[in-house]
Amino acid sequence: MSLLTEVETPIRNEWGCRCNDSSDPLVVAASIIGILHFILWILDRLFFKCIYRFFKHGLKRGPSTEGVPESMREEYRKEQQSAVDADDSHFVSIELE
């Protein structure tokens, strides 16, 4: 029986499931995954501003420089800047007459 055709119906004044194979491990796993997905969706809707603000701004910071000497920090900054400058040379400048 397909999961899409299983319907809960009132049986003897209680809600029950007509399917006999509800103890099947695949059905149990699908139910657990569905419940977890629903919980994560609710949390996402409740805290989406905090979550996306963290990913937007929090991950833009570079690697931690705690405990690194200032000379090595400056060298790292120069390497990063030279990498950016090198990428600029890949663009073609087209001038219209």
From Swiss-Prot:
Protein name as it appears in the record: Matrix protein 2
Note: When the channel is activated, one or more imidazole moieties of His-37 probably become bi-protonated.
UniProt function note: Forms a proton-selective ion channel that is necessary for the efficient release of the viral genome during virus entry. After attaching to the cell surface, the virion enters the cell by endocytosis. Acidification of the endosome triggers M2 ion channel activity.
Location in or out of the cell: Virion membrane; Host apical cell membrane
A single Gene Ontology CC term: host cell plasma membrane
Entry text on domains: Cytoplasmic tail plays an important role in virion assembly and morphogenesis.
Listed HAMAP family: INFV_M2
Highest taxon listed in the record's lineage: Viruses
